[in-house]
Amino acid sequence: MSVSRRWWVSSIAVLAVVGTGLAVRSERRAISADLDRARDLHGTGFVGSVACRRCHVAHYASWSHTFHRSMTAEASPASVLGDFSGATLTNDGVAARMDRDADGGYRMTFTRAGAPPRIAKVVRTVGSRRYQQYLARDGDTYWRLPVAYHVEEKRWFPMTGAFLFSDPDPDAPAELPAATPDRPVFGGGDFDRHVARWNDNCVFCHNVAPNPGRDRATGSFNTSVAELGVACEACHGPGAEHASRNADPVRRYALYAAPRADPTIVNPSRLPPTRSADLCGRCHGQRIADEVAPFLEHGDPFVPGDDLALESAPLWRDTPLHGDREAFAARFWRDGTARLTAYEYQGLLQSPCMMRGPLTCTSCHGMHEGDPRGQMRVGLTGRTENRMCTHCHAALAEPDAVAHHTHHDPAASGGSCASCHMPRIVYGVLDVHRSHRIEIPDPARAASGGRPDACTTCHVDRTVAWAETAARAFWGGDRFPASAVVAGGSSPREAILGGEPVARAVAA
């Protein structure tokens, strides 16, 4: 290469570097001004998870392995987990058959003596971990069918078996009402108890940007979602502006050096603890809208980063519904602790770790890491699970400190922070889960609240009175004064034979 040509090539390279540097510097100034504006993603469009994958390949891949991704899907060989090869289920006088039609579609046929068979075409699936539910479509309305598939045990079961209600009177005649727009009939009677309309119920928590689209005058629905399932924009907010503006590589590189977060998207890890918890609480804490009609007509206005309390309030034991303060009582123990799942957010709100500390959902759970079953952060399971607490309670990090604090072997279940402070007393999706009301275990308080206590969930051959005596011996009578509430008391073995269904499940 001649000297003159090398000079020109070198000059062009220098100019390119200088030009890029000037462009980045200019973009940094623009970003600096951009960062000063308040984030407001209301009115911003959605682009879908595939658009996010173009830049965020690793995050897309980790999300793809979660059960959030498959929360709702169109029925297809990729999404349907149930046995539709002609499997049958008989319950409450109804015979259900699950098979495929001539076109390969999925269907359920329900037959009851004295009534014609009813055929429901399965068009969508809900869930993919413990059990999978199925939706049929009738015009503009989707209905949850009365039969579900247990993924882990590979069997069909009636939806009445997934909820805690009294069994129907076996001698009562089956009710076979005519189908109406507000209530279809599949098997009829109690078999259909948990048939539910998806458009103004399940849609809110299992999809991105749900909008029931209810017409107030006709009661019909024009339901829409930005994406089926719980995808990127459910947690990060609508991404149209973010995707458009960050298509410019100069802006992307300039953002790396920016002192604050990109205002065109939400990073939950950069939100204040309460706002971060609000994001999860939108679905993991059942709530009621301040004004129900706008929610049904236009959708939930919440976007990640919002204060969840601006448009809705969490349900509590005494939350009234049409003046009835007992409407939600069965979802909680007597003392207001959640009895059923989907109230984890309420548990956090009752926890001193959140009320007086920095605890939030992502302190323990990682949406892009860990086992999809629970999505615990790496390093917070098994023998190292106590780290979820000792990052604040550092004095209890060493085994000797754990043994002194718990009076248990630190390597055994009694040395686990969660065993005592988050006992498994919550029922849902066919399993018993940890309470998210993080508190000091107190047998007397648990007994007065009508719920199982942490001690006897492990010491199943002991009574609550024994647990109270042990607590006073270990930690002092000042903290645990004697209580007449637990005099005598019962054991979990006796609870198995009792009438409280969640207590039976906990004891089992």
Feature roles, as predicted:
Residues 1-5:
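Short, Lys/Arg-rich N-terminal segment immediately upstream of the first membrane anchor
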Residues 10-22:
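Hydrophobic membrane-insertion alpha-helices, especially the h-region
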Residues 20-32:
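Membrane-interface motif at the C-terminal end of an N-terminal transmembrane signal
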Residues 29, 33-36, 50, 58-127, ...:
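Primarily the internal scaffold of c-type cytochrome electron-transfer domains
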Residues 42-57:
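Local sequence-structure signature of Cys/Sec-based thiol-disulfide redox active-site neighborhoods
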Residues 171, 187, 201-205:
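Long, basic N-terminal domains or extensions that often function
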Residues 176-182:
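Surface-exposed intrinsically disordered loops and tails
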Residues 199-213:
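Conserved catalytic alpha/beta cores of large enzymes that bind or transform nucleotide phosphates
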